[in-house]
Amino acid sequence: MKTSVLPGVLLLSAASAGLQAADVNDVQNHYRDSGAGPFSFDRGEMLWNSQFYEGRQCATCHGTDLTRNGRHERTQKPIEPMAASVNTTRYKDLKEVEKWFMRNCKWTWGRECTPQEKGDLLEYLKRL
């Protein structure tokens, strides 16, 4: 009797796809669960363009055209575009999004971002 491995492969593939199914709205829902929202494009844009800790702003490294690559000011490492329209996978992994918010908020703002600020920034970035 021959057994097919195809059903098992299909099941594993479907399960793996479920892990990657999140999008920017799912990430924002995580912040809503923390009591944040509603999120605002205008507040996100204002936060993006404001100067914070030691005169830094998001555009210092990410640039002003968020459909293009940026460059980290200190390390000179390239940064992929932030606009969701050209970088469709950037905001699909909550753990990855949180890691970068933690690093970048502390470096740019001198503190962690609030869930409201994160949601507003994502609202801005997802519409570009």
Residue ranges and their predicted role:
Residues 53-65, 121:
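The canonical Cys-X-X-Cys-His
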Residues 79-95:
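Short microdomains enriched in Cys/His and/or Lys/Arg
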Residues 5-13:
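Sec-dependent N-terminal signal peptides
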Residues 70-77:
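Short cysteine/histidine-rich zinc-coordinating motifs and their immediately flanking basic loops
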Residues 14-18:
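N-terminal signal peptide c-region/cleavage motif recognized by signal peptidases
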Residues 98-128:
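C-terminal capping alpha-helices of c-type cytochrome domains
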Residues 22-52:
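Electrostatic cytochrome c docking/interface patches
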